[in-house]
Amino acid sequence: ASGAITAGKPVIVNSNGTVAQVFENVDSATLAVSGSYTFESAAGSGALYVSICFDSVNNKIAIAYQDIGNSNKLTVAVGTVNTNGSITFGTPVLAYNASPTYFHIVYAGSGKVVIAYQDTSAGGGASKVGTISGNSVSFGSQSSDFTGNGNTIQGVYAAYDSNADRVVLAYKDANDGDDGVAVVGTVSGTSISYGSTTKFASSGIGTTWDLHFDSSNNKIVIAYSDGGNNYYGTCKVGTVSDTSISFGSAAVFESADSRAFAICFDSTNNKMIIAYKDTGNSNYATAVVGTVSGTSISYGTPAVFNSANTYEDHSIDHDSNAGKHVIVWSLQSGLTNKYAIGTVSGTSLSYTTSANLGDTAEQLDIVFDSNVNKFAVAYDNESSSNNGVARTIQLAYNNTTNNLTSENFIGFAKDAVADGASATLHTA
């Protein structure tokens, strides 16, 4: 016997021919929000604007931000989320020796991150590949201009297509009618190269947009406000092929001016969740379920998750362990940080009553750390000199597992058996 067996208990046969008692393991947790952990607090400084990602190879979070105490230069802090909900940060690392207004950091597979940003010296957009080691990161050389034409970008967001092993950037081209443009990047070692650009919106886009990878359908989904259609909330589905991306038709999910987009993939239900600010409904914080089929997307009915005027930012990610997602945002009045927990059922959404996260901020970003099954939320703490801080959120769950399958049950133990001893079984 492999392990002790109690008389009368069901028994399985292992692949090596030994037998073991059927066991049941219950793994559970209750909802918990941690205190704040500082990643940038030098005297007279702090963090402006933040972007966070999770490196699933090294089990680290990486936070990109503007360091107020160093002329707003682009900086990255790497941290470890611990099982007790605390976060341990290493020494921040300079990523770009200038102060870009627009930037985004994304996990790029194989223990790498990519940080994309506005090139303030040469124009256009640039990026670097970061390699994480411990609670630190080192960067390769700056890439060539990903716009291909030196045009000014006004915002850049990124997603990683794990099927194609490519990074997709989406940006606004300020020199070409504020059109929405996408480009595919290929990481090789510590460098990244880009293919040709593709427009996903040719009549201008609004001030925010977001994109995420649907791993069930191997598609990139971009949410944006369509300037050619009254800035309605819209999505397009993109397919990456080597160094290019193509898009299906535009699909409207909100027939009103929509802003502050955030999007994630719900791997429990194989759905996209899009959060946004609905200006047609008193600027309420709203979300909708999207179902991808081929290069098209259809929607359920939008659900309000906060009946108050929200600031120009939301962030969202999904907890694959608890099967739920969390949205974070700040209120327009007072910049109070809030969060809500969402559940998908078919194409419908339901939310818990929104709760205070703690502190105030103009901008927050959230990511799920699958190593410890907790969310990490980074923000500029308006309550404390814009210090860069992060908190963790642990969702409640109750998961039961056992070692019994439809094929390995062999019978019941006749007598109590010690570990390593022979067992006699009743098989009928």
Name what the model sees in each region:
Residues 1-33, 398-428:
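Surface-exposed, low-hydrophobicity beta-strand/loop segments enriched in small/polar/acidic residues
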